[in-house]
UniProtKB/Swiss-Prot annotation:
Family assignment from sequence similarity: Belongs to the ascaphin family.
UniProt-annotated location(s): Secreted
Task performed by this protein: Antimicrobial peptide that shows higher potency against Gram-negative bacteria than against Gram-positive bacteria. Has a very week hemolytic activity.
Coiled-coil segments on the chain, per record: none
Name of the protein in its database record: Ascaphin-3
Main location: secreted
GO cellular component labels: extracellular region
Record's keyword annotation contains Secreted: yes
Keywords: Amphibian defense peptide, Antibiotic, Antimicrobial, Secreted
Lineage: Eukaryota, Metazoa, Chordata, Craniata, Vertebrata
Biological-process GO terms, alphabetical: defense response to Gram-negative bacterium
Tissue specificity annotation: Expressed by the skin glands.
Length: 24
């Protein structure tokens, strides 16, 4: 459903942000 898509996008976003922070 729409909520699952939102959850997936949020997870991917957090993963990306965490990756950027880890690279610094």
């Amino acid at each position: 459903g729409f909520r699952d898509v939102l959850k997936g996008a949020a997870k991917a976003f957090v993963k990306t942000v965490a990756g950027h922070i880890a690279n610094i």
